[in-house]
Regions:
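Transmembrane beta-barrel strands of outer-membrane/channel proteins
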Residues: 48-50, 66, 79-83, 101, ...
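Solvent-exposed loop/turn segments connecting transmembrane beta-strands
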Residues: 52-60, 88-94, 121-129, 210-218, ...
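Outer-membrane pore/translocation modules
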Residues: 90-184, 236
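Outer-membrane beta-barrel "beta-signal"
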Residues: 254-266
């Protein structure tokens, strides 16, 4: 992306990651892949990736996340945090970060309520600050299990969230809106396929509609493929597509992001 790979001398330094490909947008941590145990107690998961390219130009990319989940009886308390730093020739290109606090209450084996709040900044997407708060209901619609060799699930979530965004004014035309505070609907669909407790494929689609303008909506689709190496370690391939129907004028309305790395769960 930053260099013509056929004409440059390339050196890769990878820390807990084999490849990190970034096209236009920010990688969003998909909470579906991080915690899959349904037992009381504390779980911790982490993802790290780093890529260094040197030659006619110097590019450094660092991505990270640290996440906690605590379950007691029917309640789940979760904290997600992470970010991404990109520099070229020792000049910062992007520095993004996020944190999310989430609470889930399990009504029964198929249904749960959820509440969350999230704070985010992203230089590529021009966010100085993005603050979210929402709640909703999640229902399992499909649950197919054949002994221990195959498991298929499909969940549907509905809810509402309040979204406050403050954009970087220095990059926008003088008269363009830089502050919004919108109420959006939440619609998400999560499908998962697990084979022999080794391979898991998760597809998640989020649709967020501004309640007072049908032309303003956001769509995110993410596919995660995890191959379990041992009890605590999985190889992860993520492909993410994001669409914003009304992006800032300096941005395109589509992002694509892919990552290959490792997920560590304790």
């Amino acid at each position: 992306m930053y260099l013509n790979m056929f004409n440059k001398k390339i050196f890769f330094s990878v820390v807990i990651c084999f490849l990190n490909s970034i096209f236009f947008g920010q990688s969003i941590v998909n909470t579906e892949k991080l915690f899959n145990k349904n037992k009381d107690g504390l779980q911790v998961s982490s993802e790290f990736n780093s890529t260094s390219i040197s030659g006619n130009a110097s590019v450094f990319i660092l991505g990270y996340s640290l996440n906690f989940s605590y379950k007691k009886n029917k309640s789940y308390f979760r904290i997600f945090s992470g970010g991404q730093y990109i520099s070229q020739n020792k000049t910062e290109v992007s520095n993004s970060a996020f944190s999310q606090l989430r609470y889930d209450y399990q009504i029964n084996s198929k249904s749960r309520y959820f509440m969350f709040t999230q704070l985010q900044s992203n230089a590529i997407l021009l966010f100085n600050r993005r603050l979210l708060a929402g709640l909703g209901f999640r229902r399992n619609l499909i649950n197919i299990e054949r002994d221990s060799s195959l498991k298929i699930n499909f969940d549907l979530s509905l809810g509402l969230m309040q979204e406050e965004e403050v954009l970087n004014r220095s990059t926008l035309p003088q008269n363009e809106k830089y502050y919004t505070n919108y109420t959006r609907s939440i619609l998400s669909m999560v499908g998962s396929w697990k084979y022999k407790k080794k391979l898991t494929v998760i597809n998640t689609t989020y649709f967020q509609q501004y309640l007072f303008s049908f032309s303003d909506y956001r769509l995110l689709n993410e596919t995660n493929m995890l191959y379990k190496l041992n009890k605590n370690l999985s190889l992860s391939l993520d492909i993410e597509y994001r669409f914003d129907s009304e992006p800032p004028s300096q941005l395109t309305n589509k992002d694509l992001n892919s990552n290959i790395g490792l997920v560590i769960v304790f």
